[in-house]
Structures are given as structure tokens and as C-alpha cells.
Design a protein with these regions (language model features):
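Bacterial carbohydrate/catabolite-sensing allosteric modules
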Residues: 1-62, 71-198
Length: 198
């Protein structure tokens, strides 16, 4: 029986659906896999070494998780543990990544709004986070290719702050400065909530 640890934020639907999809796959191929959820607080409080120690104690075959690019993920391989990174901040070059078509998501958003007749577009996201950057790139490039007279604006927070932290006053000022009517794409649901709360 394969033992797989998940180190991710299970308050997000993406992580729960990822776990569900892997469980369904294991069932569909007739595999008996033991799937264990680990909170990110283990990594954040005690470091990646604590995750590795826990994985060794649990005799884990693999760890799928959100890792910082400063985490020494090669330590997993040295201990015979397969490691797969879930999109978090940046992709890894040394281990496989679970990722999505983020550029395409941005493109689809821009195409949808353009078909609705919008001429002013804006993007709200987080800078230096792979999924936010690629969604903005797809959104912006599609807007610019559709019509050079379309306007585009972006507000992207720095990643130095926690992903959930935002400046309400800055967001309100930016929203008020946008030409109306405006089509706004947020990089994720949390950022969309920020807009509706502002």
C-alpha cells in the first residue's frame, strides 16, 4: 500500500479537489493508497526538516505539497521519498509540479469580458506568484491583442506580505480610478472577495 502525505491548505477547494481526484484515481486503478493530510503549519512552524522527519516516521512513499522555493526539497529524495510540488509561489525545476493552465484561464477571462462588450479591463492579483502572474499575462495579452484601444490596468500586491493580506485603502483608490464600466479579473477567489468587500 502506497502512503502519500499531502502538505497543503485544505481550506481551499483546489487542495480538497486535488486530494479527491487522487483518491478517485487510486480507486479507479485498483490501488490501495493511504492518503494523509498534513497542515501547512508543520512546515511553517518547524521547517521542511520536520516534514521530512514526519514522512520518515510515517513511512511515506510520497509527499505532495506546497513548498517554498527556499525549501531543500532534495532532502526528500535523499530519504527515498518521492516529492511533487503543488503550485504555490514558483515552479520547481528539480521535482515534478502539479500545475494548471493559468495563462489560458486569463485568456478565457479576457475573451469572455470582450464578448460582453467591455472596453476597459483590470486585473487584481499578487506579484511573483506563478498562478497569479500567468493569469494576468494571459488576460493582458488577450486584451491587447483584441483591440489596441482597450485599456488595461493592474494592481498586484507584493508577495512579501501574506497572500491574504491586503491594503483596503489602496484597493478602493485603485478601483475608483478605473474607467467605467470596467471588467475586473481577480487572480483567485480570495482576491475577488477583497474586491467585493472594498
Amino acid at each position: 500500500m502506497a502512503r502519500i502525505l499531502f502538505l497543503t491548505d485544505f481550506s481551499e477547494a483546489y487542495a480538497r479537489n486535488l486530494l479527491l481526484g487522487i483518491a478517485r484515481y487510486a480507486h479507479a486503478v485498483g490501488q490501495a493508497w493511504s492518503l494523509c493530510r498534513l497542515p501547512l503549519s508543520i512546515r511553517d512552524k518547524f521547517g521542511i526538516e520536520a516534514v521530512i522527519d514526519l514522512a520518515k516516521k510515517m513511512r511515506a512513499d510520497a509527499v505532495i505539497g506546497q513548498f517554498y522555493n527556499t525549501d531543500n526539497v532534495e532532502l526528500f529524495a535523499r530519504n527515498g521519498i518521492i516529492t511533487i510540488a503543488q503550485d504555490f509561489k514558483a515552479r520547481f525545476t528539480t521535482i515534478p509540479n502539479i500545475t494548471g493552465p493559468h495563462f489560458l484561464a486569463g485568456k478565457m477571462g479576457a475573451e469572455y469580458f470582450a464578448k460582453k462588450g467591455f472596453r476597459h479591463f483590470a486585473f487584481y492579483g499578487t506579484r511573483d506568484v506563478v498562478w497569479s502572474d500567468e493569469r494576468m499575462q494571459g488576460f493582458r495579452e488577450t486584451v491587447r491583442a483584441a483591440n489596441p484601444s482597450f485599456t488595461f490596468s493592474a494592481l498586484c500586491k507584493n508577495t512579501q506580505n501574506a497572500l491574504w493580506d491586503y491594503d483596503t485603502n489602496q484597493l478602493v483608490t485603485w478601483l475608483q480610478s478605473l474607467p467605467k464600466p470596467v471588467a475586473i479579473m481577480a487572480c483567485d477567489d480570495n482576491h475577488a472577495y477583497h474586491i467585493t468587500e472594498a
